[in-house]
Amino acid sequence: MENRWQVMIVWQVDRMRINTWKRLVKHHMYISRKAKDWFYRHHYESTNPKISSEVHIPLGDAKLVITTYWGLHTGERDWHLGQGVSIEWRKKRYSTQVDPDLADQLIHLHYFDCFSESAIRNTILGRIVSPRCEYQAGHNKVGSLQYLALAALIKPKQIKPPLPSVRKLTEDRWNKPQKTKGHRGSHTMNGH
């Protein structure tokens, strides 16, 4: 019988970012209790030796599983040290992979207080609304003019430490274009 391959999207992430993610998840599970329903699975609880950890986030009758890996093949650059993250949505026997933005939106729908679009309608109806959004990573678009006006009145409260964002975990901070301050290009290229 032939070998069968299963392809999975694994976001290449540096080790320090994964460690920060794990610390934030554990802090909000055990200390702040904002993520008390989440489940953290250690590497020694997994049968796969490449799995570093798993975070199971219940979403109603489904769940989001964020798996961190170690010991993968290194990437093209020196800092790609064989660490990675996969994000999976599971419901009963069905599972699919999701991108970090969608993962943050799914987390935001089920956890953390939010001052959202529905706040405008609820405010007009005289209902009490949450004064601010605790999980800004869950919003990926610019709100309506009314939403922006109401949000401008209420400054977001900085939560220390911040809530764990999947988008922030998988963000590629190495390949972004560098920003130089003050100078308009190279001195040698400008002829100065």
Curated annotation (Swiss-Prot):
Q: Where is this region: RNA-binding?
A: 75-114
Family per similarity comment: Belongs to the primate lentivirus group Vif protein family.
Q: What is this protein called?
A: Virion infectivity factor
The gene name on file is vif
Q: Where is this motif: BC-box-like motif?
A: 144-153
Induction note? Expressed late during infection in a Rev-dependent manner.
For the region Disordered, what residue ranges are annotated?
A: 165-192
Extract the GO molecular function terms from the UniProt entry.
Answer: RNA binding
- Report the outcome of L148A: 35% loss of interaction with CUL5
Phosphothreonine: which positions carry it? Answer: T96, T188
Cite the binding residues for Zn(2+): H108, C114, C133, H139
- Cite the effect that the entry attributes to R15 to D/E: Strongly reduced interaction with host APOBEC3F without affecting interaction with host APOBEC3G
Q: Reported effect of changing K160A?
A: 33% loss of viral infectivity
Q: What is known of its domains?
A: The BC-like-box motif mediates the interaction with elongin BC complex. The HCCH motif (H-x(5)-C-x(18)-C-x(5)-H) mediates the interaction with CUL5.
Q: Where is the composition biased (Basic residues)?
A: 176-186
- Consequence of changing H108L: Complete loss of interaction with CUL5
The consequence of K50E is: Strongly reduced interaction with host APOBEC3G and APOBEC3F
Ranges for region SOCS box-like: 151-180
Q: What is the effect of changing L169A?
A: Does not affect interaction with host ELOC
* Protein topology in the membrane: Peripheral membrane protein
Can you state the subunit structure given in the record?
Answer: Homomultimer; in vitro and presumably in vivo. Interacts with viral RNA and Pr55Gag precursor; these interactions mediate Vif incorporation into the virion. Interacts with the viral reverse transcriptase. Forms cullin-5-RING E3 ubiquitin-protein ligase complex (ECS complex) by interacting with host CUL5, RBX2, elongin BC complex (ELOB and ELOC) and CBFB/CBF-beta. Within the ECS complex, Vif interacts directly with host CUL5, ELOC and APOBEC (APOBEC3F and APOBEC3G) substrates.
List UniProt keywords, sorted A-Z: AIDS, Host cell membrane, Host cytoplasm, Host membrane, Host-virus interaction, Membrane, Phosphoprotein, RNA-binding, Ubl conjugation, Ubl conjugation pathway, Virion
Q: Where is this region: Interaction with host APOBEC3F and APOBEC3G?
A: 54-72
